[in-house]
């Protein structure tokens, strides 16, 4: 019964941004071109996720609720695995209650469905991968590095201000490889990581290129955010800190 009440409450969301994301996503899947026919300044991956959620819930936010549940579950599970690596032993699943409560009480969760919320599993996966590399005697498999590049590309086209986190990830891993004398592996890993980034970017280059909207894409997502957007978390200072 309580789950049905939650679903009923998810039929709407009074946060303006979530409704904008939903409109952008549904418009995209309806044939309109992002940034050219409909305008907002977040990344296209965010709108794609909202559009797919709209296929589940129609015009309400039940599909977004499902998306939030998947994102939070993935974040908590990956966080638990990371904590187990650091502790060197298995941990009870009840430890997940602490980060769950902390994240749910944070400002990014005040309405639900924010870009930061949907980024959590990507950031948790990167952190787990890095901690695992630090505890491993061998180099990371190139496939794993490529996957992290792919996830970093998804984060780039969801909300680019988190790139500072991924830059730190690359620097730490590169320092580890240099310290261990793995120069050849470092070169191959750089190629694999950039390949993953390219895989995440190429579909959007094709999408906007086919519709003649590459200029609209870069103007709205980069130029407008860097130089015109004056809202909280926008502009050049946003590159130095994640909102």
Model-derived segments and their meaning:
Residues 1-7:
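Short, small-residue-biased leader/transition segments that mark boundaries at the very start
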Residues 44, 48, 57-77:
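Loop-to-helix entry region of an early transmembrane alpha helix in multi-pass inner-membrane enzymes
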Residues 66-89, 125, 129:
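Transmembrane-helix motifs of polytopic, lipid-linked glycan transferases
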Residues 79-103, 120-121, 137-143:
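Transmembrane-helix signature of polytopic, membrane-embedded enzymes
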Residues 126-147, 180:
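Membrane-interface transmembrane helices that cradle and orient dolichyl/undecaprenyl
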Residues 189-231:
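Membrane-lumen/periplasm interface segments of specific transmembrane helices
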């Amino acid at each position: 019964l309580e789950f049905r009440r939650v679903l009923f409450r998810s039929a709407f969301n009074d946060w303006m941004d979530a409704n904008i994301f939903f409109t952008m996503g549904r418009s995209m899947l309806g044939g309109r071109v992002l940034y050219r026919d409909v305008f907002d300044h977040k990344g296209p991956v965010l709108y794609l996720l909202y559009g797919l959620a709209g296929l589940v819930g129609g015009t309400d936010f039940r599909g977004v609720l499902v998306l939030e549940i998947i994102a939070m579950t993935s974040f908590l599970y990956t966080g638990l695995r990371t904590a187990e690596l650091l502790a060197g032993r298995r941990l009870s699943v009840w430890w997940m209650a602490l980060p769950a409560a902390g994240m749910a009480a944070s400002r990014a969760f005040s309405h639900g469905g924010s870009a930061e919320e949907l980024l959590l599993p990507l950031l948790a996966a990167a952190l787990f991968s890095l901690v695992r590399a630090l505890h491993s005697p061998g180099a990371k498999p190139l496939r794993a590095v490529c996957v992290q590049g792919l996830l970093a590309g998804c984060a780039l086209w969801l909300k680019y201000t988190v790139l500072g986190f991924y830059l730190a990830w690359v620097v730490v891993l590169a320092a580890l490889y240099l310290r261990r004398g793995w120069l050849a592996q470092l070169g191959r890993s750089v190629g694999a990581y950039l390949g993953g980034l390219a895989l995440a970017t190429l579909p959007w280059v094709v999408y906007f290129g086919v519709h003649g909207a590459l200029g609209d894409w870069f103007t709205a997502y980069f130029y407008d955010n860097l130089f015109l957007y004056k809202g909280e978390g926008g502009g050049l200072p946003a590159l130095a800190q994640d909102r």
